[in-house]
Amino acid sequence: MTAAAVMLAACSAGDDGAASIATTVDAGPPISTNAGNSSVPAVSAPGEVVVEQAVESEVEDTPSGLSAARGGAVDGLPEPLVPVTELRSGGPPPDGIPPIDHPKFVSVAGVDFLAENEPVMAVDIGGDARAYPVQILIWHEIVNDTVGGVPLAVTYCPLCNSAVAYDRRVGGRVMSFGTSGLLWNSALVMYDRQTETLWSHFNGEAIVGMLTGTELETFPVATVPWGVWRDAHPEGLVLSRDTGFDRDYGSNPYPGYDDITSQPFLFEGEVDGRFTAMTRVVGIELEGSALAVPLVLLREQGVVPATVDGQDLTVWWVPGTASALDEGAIVDGDDIGATGVFVPVVDGNALTFTPSGGGFIDDQTGSTWNLLGMAVAGPLVGRQLEPVEHVDTFWFAWSAFRPDTAVAASA
């Protein structure tokens, strides 16, 4: 299957794929969910939950980075961080892979479409815990949402298998993000509807357009199995399949893509020779220092202690999560497991951990912890480790964007 065919497989299914850039109302302060009471969602129907969204800013009359990258005029734009010649069309036009701009949610009790092992992207801001099923994101790549009062873009790039969440607030604006139809290093390139600046999904930096050089703030995302997230957040919210689009949710439009012997689509750089292109790694970056933890090492050890920019971390792995990029049905995908990265400190006391029965036990108190860093039994029950931003991705992508990355070795 060609790269264009793969990308188009995730595109039209009843819609024409044309960009839809609606003028929004005046910018204002973010609207917290549920009219300021995010702990008590408003239920509109059994299982369905109503959440309020931030007010997005108006479209601005500025030169378009999106147009420039597609062969248009570049007059009036700052020097791009990435030569437009390095951007590749994935096939679909802008928003041909349609983002979800008006997300609907269901309660945990209302979910009947996820298997225990299906991957969900977990976000928790101020106790507002949400799960975004990869079976939905694989078809849309971006959800413009508001979580814990923060306007958030929850993003997923299938070609890099990378999940990242970004604050949509930029210079007093609240942005709305779409898919540009372009790729850089085989990774999703987003654009904002307010200025049509292009942004790298992988590092959150504006690369072509009026906001070139601006960086988005990130929030931690963990890709975990539905069963683990459900048990940890019985009162949480789950992105609904009621997206307004006709897609075959639960199926994988990129079957076989994650084969270790395959090559990434539309990646024209040289792959760092330390691993093959499609080797899975956990990527961590703190203050410019980067570390890749190979998944094979995590499979062997379960827990890998790490230090990045002087910060001690603990990196975890448990089995039980299906690959979304393997079989035609996501639920049938190979068990690649799931990861978590945390600061291993509680009340100033450093902890070390040992894998145990699908969770972890700290060696200091004997408390049991789940994959989301919550103590579920023992003296520290109810405590939460500080999560650290990380990305589960392929080596070709991590090493392309972080060429100076170190690699974790066996303990």
Question: What residues fall within each predicted segment?
Answer:
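Mid-to-C-terminal functional-domain signal that highlights helix-capping/loop sites
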Residues: G17-A411
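Short, conserved catalytic or interaction motifs in soluble domains
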Residues: A13
